[in-house]
Amino acid sequence: MLYFGECVLVYSKIVCNGLWFVYNVAMDRKQLTKQLNNQTLIIWDNLCELYSPLTKYNPPIIEINGRIYRTAGRCHQEDNLIHMGYKFFLYSKEFYNNMFNIILPHEIIHQADYNLFGLSEATCGHGKKWQEIMINYGLSPDKHHNMWIK
């Protein structure tokens, strides 16, 4: 991976007819953050339709963290902040899509759970209330992702 200001040049491998090819993808961190924040607003609005008390809260702030390697995302409920693992966006198109469609809502729902029910043993983490919100949002309440970066 090479850094050029706000852009990152990523070298990845693809297989075509059994042959490995190397291709590079330029990913602008600012543009990615903007896309994540736009998607966050959509997800938050959908959650507010399901749970009207959420309308009195601001959607969480999204930050990209290049130091997260195993965790795709991490919600810091008391700070209304979500860190997303940058490497997962760069690894493959499938991981990129999973980060937007599964991991981002998963982390936002942690914030919604905290805003609705507070921080307690019953609601913290992947408790029953969080699972209920995930299901009502249309996602499987999985605790872990299956995206492994080598």
Give the location of each predicted region.
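Active-site-proximal or metal-binding-adjacent scaffold patches in catalytic folds
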Residues: 4-102, 111-150
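Walker B catalytic acidic pair
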Residues: 107
